[in-house]
């Protein structure tokens, strides 16, 4: 049998389950959209703290809007077997998660893994910018869609598990998570954005090797290794790597997995940038910084960008700047990278020379330089950096909601690219936020409103509310926030409230109530009542029945109320009474007709002299209900000798 929640989401088959929830395929019947509905396990839903955390984290997830994040459309609670169970309505993604892909298709090459994890890092950066730490980055929470897209799931939901019970005491919920747990989380310390970066490094390790960096018989054993042990460099498990490629992939993975958060990439964007270099076989900043640190350990860093999250890539032959992860902390490095450094220092001519050959000597006749990282720099400073590196600079302008006016949004070719000196580099400089007036979408359908907002560069908030309305037809917009005409930044989100039509109200049972009171009650409820008076023996003005009683009708509906006029009385038994006695008996019963309305008909012949002029027939008959203003017909006995003879 079909199960519908919130009068909107029609649930179908279970498409996934985990230690804390079940996920159903579902349809949003309001707008005809396929969705997924995640429900908390009923035993966990009985914990008020757990339920509240789940609800709040779902709301946090709903704040995120990114193409690589599974969108959260709605949240709520539904009664199941007497327990209020929280649920989350999400975008339904058609595809497989990374764990399934690796199991079924095998490992990724480092370049393939980098291309998968770049959008993951971008999604994490969007989450971190919104103040949300994922806390449960793992292959099972990363989907590859049927069209090749990447979607990150379950933002913030793991926090509910951690708040309810220790991650290390609920084995069934953590065995998958423990393999991607950062050292600080394993020690019970708070997680931050760099904890997600550590987990992403663990995911990349698994993608390129086919196994997690640490394995053990229990979550405790795995967590211990995260804190105390260095992982085997992933290149040890990857065949057919050149020395430079091996160092490159090891540097990226092991930098992300550094034991101390200060030694990791400091932002997901920084890791995404290095993954981008890895994906195009350019030397990563992690590898470059490590080679230089080990080859010239006493040399100070030479130059820093004004942004601390990225390194300024120098021209060929010039010492590189430290990454924004911090100078002294990055020099500490993880022991895994120290091992790499030993290899590099022992084989300066071989491996380090290979870097020089592979990346800095692409042309025997033309000098090249790496494009320095000018993203986020003021225009003039970026111009100076690029000209000092030997490039011709072309400047274009573009509005941006994220980059302040006058700062560089991006470079083309991209930062870190090795190109010949004297080539042209185009930098795009922000003109600030582009503002636009919000269009009026009131009275539109949801589809038309979404299209109107999209046409001007605005985004429809997927959490669409519904309200009843006496004035606006069901399915049309009745309110928008921000209001129409307000000036906002292009790319802003607009929330809509849709009409569900006129409010429906249950018609009450008013039988036996006085009509005047019943009328007031119905009017106060929003109905338009009309009385229909019927002949009845009930007291005058008493309600006999109400049309559509017990059903729900739209507010403003007309209601017919049947009301007693009190005109029916019960006919008394007039047998063998005189007409005078009959009139008295009728009056006592409530008869209001004039005395002349007692109609005496043809006599009834009788041989009993005692019955002379007594009533022998009446209409209506005794106990019959009749109108109290109606005529009463009687026939009197008349003594007849002939009847005696007969």
UniProtKB/Swiss-Prot annotation:
Keywords: ATP-binding, Kinase, Nucleotide-binding, Repeat, Serine/threonine-protein kinase, Transferase
Ranges for domain Protein kinase: 9-278
The PASTA domain, residue ranges: 365-431, 432-500, 501-565, 570-638
Region (Disordered): 283-332
GO molecular function, one term: ATP binding
InterPro entries linked to this entry: Kinase-like_dom_sf, PASTA_dom, Prot_kinase_dom, Protein_kinase_ATP_BS, Ser/Thr_kinase_AS
Chain sites annotated for binding ATP: 15-23, 38
Low complexity biased stretches: 303-328
Active site: 136 (proton acceptor)
Gene3D superfamilies, alphabetized: 3.30.10.20, Phosphorylase Kinase, domain 1 (3.30.200.20), Transferase(Phosphotransferase) domain 1 (1.10.510.10)
Family: Belongs to the protein kinase superfamily. Ser/Thr protein kinase family.
Protein name, as recorded: Probable serine/threonine-protein kinase PknB
């Amino acid at each position: 049998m079909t199960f519908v929640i919130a009068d909107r989401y029609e649930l179908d088959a279970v498409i996934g389950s985990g230690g804390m929830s079940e996920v159903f395929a579902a349809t949003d019947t309001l707008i005809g959209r396929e969705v997924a509905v995640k429900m908390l396990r009923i035993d966990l839903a009985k914990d008020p703290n757990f339920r509240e955390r789940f609800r709040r984290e779902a709301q946090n997830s709903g704040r995120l809007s990114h193409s690589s994040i599974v969108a959260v459309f709605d949240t709520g609670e539904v009664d199941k077997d007497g327990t209020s169970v929280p649920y989350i309505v999400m975008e339904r993604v058609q595809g497989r998660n990374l764990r399934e892909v690796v199991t079924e298709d095998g490992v990724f090459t480092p370049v393939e893994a980098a291309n998968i994890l770049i959008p993951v890092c971008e999604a994490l950066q969007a989450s971190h910018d919104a103040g949300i730490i994922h806390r449960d980055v793992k292959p099972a929470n990363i989907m590859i869609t049927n069209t090749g897209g990447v979607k990150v799931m379950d933002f913030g939901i793991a926090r509910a598990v951690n708040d309810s019970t220790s991650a290390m005491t609920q084995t069934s919920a953590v065995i998958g998570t423990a393999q991607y747990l950062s050292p600080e989380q394993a020690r019970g310390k708070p997680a931050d954005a760099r904890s997600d970066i550590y987990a992403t490094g663990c995911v990349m390790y698994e993608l390129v090797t086919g196994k997690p960096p640490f394995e053990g018989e229990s979550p405790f054993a795995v967590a211990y290794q995260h804190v105390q042990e260095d992982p085997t460099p992933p290149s040890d498990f990857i065949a057919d790597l050149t020395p430079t490629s091996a160092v490159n992939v090891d540097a990226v993975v092991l930098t992300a997995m550094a034991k101390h958060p200060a030694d990791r990439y400091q932002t997901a964007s920084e890791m995404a940038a290095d993954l981008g270099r890895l994906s195009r076989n350019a030397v990563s900043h992690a590898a470059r910084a490590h080679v230089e640190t080990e080859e010239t350990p006493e040399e100070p860093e030479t130059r820093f960008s004004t942004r601390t999250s990225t390194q300024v890539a120098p021209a060929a032959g010039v010492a590189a700047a430290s990454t924004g992860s911090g100078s002294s902390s990055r020099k500490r490095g993880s022991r895994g990278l120290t091992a790499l450094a030993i290899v590099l220092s022992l084989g300066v001519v071989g491996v380090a020379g290979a870097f020089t050959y592979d990346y800095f000597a692409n042309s025997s006749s033309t000098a090249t330089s790496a494009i320095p990282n000018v993203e986020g720099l003021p225009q003039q400073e970026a111009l100076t950096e690029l000209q000092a590196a030997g490039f011709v600079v072309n400047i274009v302008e573009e509005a941006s909601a994220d980059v302040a006016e006058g700062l560089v949004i991006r470079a083309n070719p991209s930062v870190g690219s090795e190109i010949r000196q004297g080539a042209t580099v185009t930098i795009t400089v922000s003109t600030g936020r582009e503002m636009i007036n919000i269009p009026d979408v009131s009275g539109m359908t949801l589809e038309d409103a979404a299209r109107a907002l999209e046409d001007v560069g605005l985004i429809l908030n997927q959490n669409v509310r519904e309200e009843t309305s006496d004035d606006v037809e069901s399915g049309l917009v009745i309110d928008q926030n921000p209001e129409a005409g307000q000036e906002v930044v292009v790319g802003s989100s607009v929330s809509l409230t849709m009409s569900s039509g006129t409010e429906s109200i249950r018609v009450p049972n008013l039988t036996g109530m006085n009509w005047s009171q019943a009328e007031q009650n119905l009017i106060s409820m929003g109905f338009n009542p009309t009385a229909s008076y019927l002949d009845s023996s009930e007291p005058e003005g008493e309600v006999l029945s109400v049309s559509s009683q017990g059903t729900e009708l739209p507010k403003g509906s007309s209601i017919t109320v049947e009301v007693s006029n009190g005109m029916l009385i019960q006919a008394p038994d007039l047998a063998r009474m005189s007409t005078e006695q009959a009139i008295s008996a009728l009056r006592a019963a409530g008869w209001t007709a004039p005395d002349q309305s007692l109609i005496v008909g043809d006599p009834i012949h009788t041989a009993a002299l005692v019955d002379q002029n007594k009533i022998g027939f009446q209409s209506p008959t005794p106990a019959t209900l009749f109108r109290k203003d109606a005529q009463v017909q009687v026939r009197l006995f008349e003594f007849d000798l002939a009847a005696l003879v007969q």
